[in-house]
Amino acid sequence: MTGHVDPVHFERLKIQSVTFGSANDNASLQVHNVSKSPEYSKYSYSRKNNEPIEFIQLREEEGPIVKVEEEDGLTLRFQLEFHAQEGKRDVTNLTCVYGTSPQQLDRLITREFSSDANFQNNHQVFLIGNIEFHSNENSKKIEWTWSNQSLHTLYFRNGGSPIYLCFAEYDKRLNCLVPLKTFQFYVTESDQDSTPATPFPMPMHLAEETATSPEISDAPPLSGNVDPLPINSPPLTNPVARDIDQTEPEDGPLFRATILNYERTTHDMRMVLKKLIKRIEHVAHSHGLLYMSYKELMSAFERVATINPPAFKPFLDHYYAAAAQSFDSFNIDRARLLRNFLIEPLRKIYDTDIKNVSTKKKDFEETSRDYYTSLSRYLSKSEKETSSDKTKESKFAAKKRDFELSRFDYYSYMQDINGGRKGQEVLSVLTSFAANDYNLIHSSLTDIDALRPSIIQLQDIVTEANKEFQLLRAEREERRRYIETSSRELEDKDAEIAAQAYKAKVDQDTSAKQGLLLAFSKSTSDLQVVGKSGWHKYWVVLDHGKICEYANWKQSLELHTEPIDLLMATVRPAQSVSRKFCFEVITPQTKRTYQATSKAEMHSWIEAIQYSISESIVQKGKGTSMNSEETSVKHGPTSTIGKALQRVASVTSPSRHNSDSKEKKQTKSPSLVKTLKEMHSSDQSCADCNTTARVEWCAINFPVVLCIDCSGIHRSLGTHITKIRSLTLDKFNPETVDLLYATGNSFVNEIYEGGITDWKIKNFENQERRVQFVKDKYLYKRFIKSSFSHDPNTGLLESIEHSNLKEAVLCLALGADVNYQRAVVKALLKNNYLIAELLTLNGASLNVDEVTMETLSARAQAFVMNRATP
C-alpha cells in the first residue's frame, strides 16, 4: 500500500517511528519507517497480540490512514531524525502544528502565522525548539511526545475526525514556516459503539514484504483500483471555509466574465434571501398565532372544566395546564428567537450589502468608463512632452489609481458575497440560531418529559374509574332487566312487605320521607266533580311533623301551599275515591287527598305519616319546639329534608313566604356568630391575624372564622381556593352550621399552622405581609406539618370509615382528591354528614345515579337533592 510523496525537504526530516500510547504507558500501536530510501517513507503498523488494525480513506490522493481510539491520556511518541543540509545545518524554531484538514493546516502555517503576532499561543501550535548540529554531525535524532489535551475541544463528526500533524521550521530570511514532514491519523470517539471496519486491503506487493503487519508508503500511489470505504466510515470532509483567490485578474475578458458571473449569482442571492426573510417572518408570525390559539384553547378547557370537572379537570391538572404553559413559552421564545437571531441579522446583511449591489455596480462602471476615456485621450497625445502633458499624465495616473482601487473594491465585494466574508457572516448567523434553537427545543422537551409521571398517574386513575364504571354499568343493566321483567301484580303482592320494611327503616331514622304524589290544586275541591285534569303532580316532603308540597319541581322548588301540621292529624286509605293508591290526611283545618304511584308507595307513605304523627305527639308532650330553623341552630346536626328543600325553595323562587324567610335569617344569623364564639374560644379572634375586631366572616371549606380584612384577601384568591361567607348576612345549610360547630379555628390551625416555628410571622407590618401569609397558608400550604404516612386519598377513605373529621381535614390539606372513589357517597352511606359537607364545600361532585340513590337514607337523599337542585 502506497501513500503520498512529500516533495519538499523530504531529506531534511524523517519520522523513524511513532508509538501510540495511553495514560498507563501501554503502547496500543507501533508505527515504524521501514524504507531505506532517502526519497520517501514507508510505514509498518503493528499491535500487540497481532490484533487487526483499522484504516480509513478520506481522499483518494492521500491514501488510507490509520484509525485510533480517542481516550484520556492518548499520546504519540515520535522518533525524529534530522539531516544537515549544505549551507543550512541547524533547525530553527522547530514547530508542530496540527489541524483537521489539509486546508486548515495550510491556513495555520501561512496566513495565520503572518497575521497573528501571538501565533505561538494558538492551542493548535506546539513549539519544540531549535535543533543544533555539532561540527562533525550530519544527522541528529530526537524524541518528542504529542498529547491529546487539545482534542477535548475537537468536533467529532459522525464519531471521528482526521488529525494532520505537520513539523515545520522557521525561515528567518522569508519570515515564514517551512513544512518538513506531515503525519496523519484518524481519531474515533472512545464510546463509539460500532462494528470495527475491516482493515483496508493492502496491495499485493506489500503483502509479500511482510505478512504480519500492513505497511503504508509515502511513495506515489501505484496503479490499481482502490476498494470503497468501510461501512460506517465518516464523510470524506468536514465543512471548511471556501478558499478564495485574493489576487484579482487584470481587467479583461476573464475579469469581466468573472464579475458577470458574480453579478448573476448576487442577483439570484438577493431574490432568494428576500423570500427567505419573508418566510422566516411568516413562521415567527405563525408562532404568535399559535400562542394565541393555545391561549384560547386553554380558556375553552377551563370553561368546560368548571361545568364538568370530573371529565376535564384531571386532564388539566395532570397534564395540559403545565404542557400549555410550556407550549406558550416555547412559541413566544421561538418567535423572539427567529426575530432576533435570524430575521434582523439577515435583513441587516441584505440591506447593507446585497441590496446595494446595483449601486456599487453603477459606481464601478462609471469609474471604468471614465478611466478608459482618459486612456484614449492619453494615448492620442504625441510622444513629445510638454509641461502641460506632465500635468495631464499625473491626472491620468490618478484616474488609473482610482480605477484600480474601484476594481479591487468591487471584486472584493463580489467575492465577499459569493462565498466569502459575507457568506461566512450568514453561516455564523445560522449557526448561532441553530445553537439557541437547539437549547430552546431541548428545554421544552425536558419540561414535557417531566410530565410523564403525571400522565402515568392520570392513566391509572382513568383505568380505575373505568373498572368502577363497568361495575356500575353491570348494576344498571341488572336493574333495567329487573324493571322490564317485574309486573304490577308482583308489586301489589309485595306492597305489604315493602311497607313493613319501610316502617323498620323509619324506626331507625327520623320521621322523614319525600317523593312524587298526585293531588288537587285546592284541598277544597270535590273529588267526585273534578276530572282527570284536576290532578297535579307535587313533590311532597314529610319532615318533623309537617307535610310540604312543592310545585314546578322539575325546574325549581316552589312551595305550593302552607305546610300541613300533623300534630292533630290522622291518615288513612281513601275509600270514597275511585282512583287507586289514594290516601287522605285529615286535620281539624283541612282534608287532603294524595295518590301514590303504587300500592307499596301508598302503604309506605301511610306508615311514615303515622310514625311522624306519633313522634309529634311525643315531642309536644316534652314541650320541645318543632320549629325546624331553631332546632338546626340550637341542637346542631338535626337538619333534615324539609328544611333543606324549604331553604332552596325560598332562595330559588320568590313567593309570599320570602318575607318570612328573611325574618328568620335576620333573627338567626347574629345568634350563629354568638354561638360559635361561645362554643370555641379560638373563634373569638381571626384564624389568620388573631385580631378580635369584626370577626364576622368565615371560609366554609376549611372551615375557619375570619376578620373582615383577612376575608377580603381570601376572596381575592378565588372561589376555587376558598369560599367566603358572612356570618351575619349569608344563609347556611344546616350541615355547614354543624361543620362550624364541630371544628373551630384552633382545630383547623393545628393542621394549617402546625409547621410554624417563629410566630412573629403573624405580626403583619403591612398589607403585603398579610397577603403573603394567607397565600402561604392556604394556597401553597407551607405551614402544614404532618407525620401522616398514608396516601392522602387512602387516608380520606379511612377517615370516612372511622368518622374522623380531623383526619379528613388533614387529608384534604395534603391534597386528597375529593372525588376519589366517590368519597361523598361513602360518607353519606355512613351517615357522616359532616365529612360529606366538607367534601361538597371543597368541590366534590354529587352526581348520584338512581341505583345508588335508593341505597341512601332519607336524610342522605335530601342532602343530595338539596345540592343537586339548580
Curated annotation (Swiss-Prot):
Name of encoding gene: csx2
Cellular component terms (Gene Ontology): cytosol; plasma membrane
UniProt domain PH: residue ranges: 510-614
Glycoprotein recorded as keyword: no
Keyword annotations: GTPase activation, Metal-binding, Phosphoprotein, Zinc, Zinc-finger
Annotated stretches, region: Disordered: 212-251, 647-672
Chain ranges of the Arf-GAP domain: 670-791
The name this protein goes by in its record: Protein csx2
Phosphoserine: modified positions: S625, S653, S655
